[in-house]
Amino acid sequence: MASELAMTAELPTSPLAIEYVNDFDLMKFEVKKEPAEAERLCHRLPAGSLSSTPLSTPCSSVPSSPSFCAPSPGGQPSAGPTAAPLGSKPQLEELYWMSGYQHHLNPEALNLTPEDAVEALIGAPHHHHHHHQSYESFRPQPFGGEELPPAAHHHNAHHHHHHHHLRLEERFSDDQLVSMSVRELNRQLRGFSKEEVIRLKQNRRTLKNRGYAQSCRYKRVQQRHILENEKCQLQSQVEQLKQEVSRLAKERDLYKEKYEKLAARGFPREPSPPAAPKTTAADFFM
């Protein structure tokens, strides 16, 4: 009974705190019994801590609650500048120990009962961790003086280098590389790195060799077609000449045969005309 009176005497007198505490019906929850060692761990503050709120138990993930009980007899008061004096009432910030879970424990906003708020509070650490992971994905990109990890530097440099290569390779078409003179190409490549210039010139040399090989192949094919056409024309002319030779040979043989027949029979002699009678002068005067 004396302990209940002592606890009642040390309860906060602020109306806001009393109203905040009275919203919860905590009497229906069972009190977890813990060993004395766990109780000592609960009442011990970490080194350098400025808060008078004890730590939570090792077996529980529920955030630590404000301490309304009297200090242990063997405990020593904290020597920190902000520590509360021995036997003093809890500070006002201890009454708002659940301020980090306002989105869980706001019955007016979520239309929840106090029991639902306590259940949400019990599952709050895991939920907070889940939200922390989800918020990590929406972290803004670093600017200016913020440091980037080496992997991010390498990724950004590789992306910029690859984009630079694409711009250089897409700057000239194949026809421009082949038709452009060496002087003009060197003038266009000023300001680029040596590796990019060497790669582009190798590409230009490959294109020129490929074009030269295609030109030679085209010329060979064209020359072969010309020679094949001339061959066909000459073959047709030879056939025509052969036919003409055979015709002339036949005609020669025909004339030769006629000549031989005529020579074998002999040519007939034509009859001489009759001689005119001689007239004398005596016949003339007769």
Swiss-Prot record:
InterPro entries: bZIP, bZIP_Maf, bZIP_sf, Maf_TF_N, TF_DNA-bd_sf, Transcription_factor_Maf_fam. The keyword Phosphoprotein applies. Forms homodimers or heterodimers. May interact (via leucine-zipper domain) with MAFB. May interact with FOS and JUN. Interacts with PCAF; this interaction impairs MAFA ubiquitination. Residues 199-224 are annotated as: Basic motif. PROSITE patterns: BZIP (PS50217). Residues 227-248 are annotated as: Leucine-zipper. The modification Phosphoserine is found at residues 14, 49, 61, 65, 272. Disulfide bonds: none annotated. It is found in: Nucleus. Belongs to the bZIP family. Maf subfamily. One of its GO terms (molecular function) is DNA-binding transcription factor activity, RNA polymerase II-specific. Its main location: nucleus. SUPFAM superfamilies: A DNA-binding domain in eukaryotic transcription factors, Leucine zipper domain. Transcription factor involved in transcription regulation during lens development, including that of crystallin and filensin/BFSP1 genes. Binds to CRE-type MARE 5'-TGCTGACGTCAGCA-3' and TRE-type MARE 5'-TGCTGACTCAGCA-3' DNA sequences. Residues 152-166 have a biased composition (Basic residues). This is Transcription factor MafA. Residues 199-262 form the bZIP domain. Residues 51-85, 277-286 have a biased composition (Low complexity). It comes from Gallus gallus (Chicken). Residues 51-87, 126-167, 265-286 are annotated as: Disordered. The keyword Cytoplasm does not apply. Keywords: DNA-binding, Nucleus, Phosphoprotein, Transcription, Transcription regulation. One of its GO terms (cellular component) is nucleus. The modification Phosphothreonine is found at residues 53, 57, 113. The gene is MAFA. One of its GO terms (biological process) is response to glucose. It holds the Pfam family Maf_N.
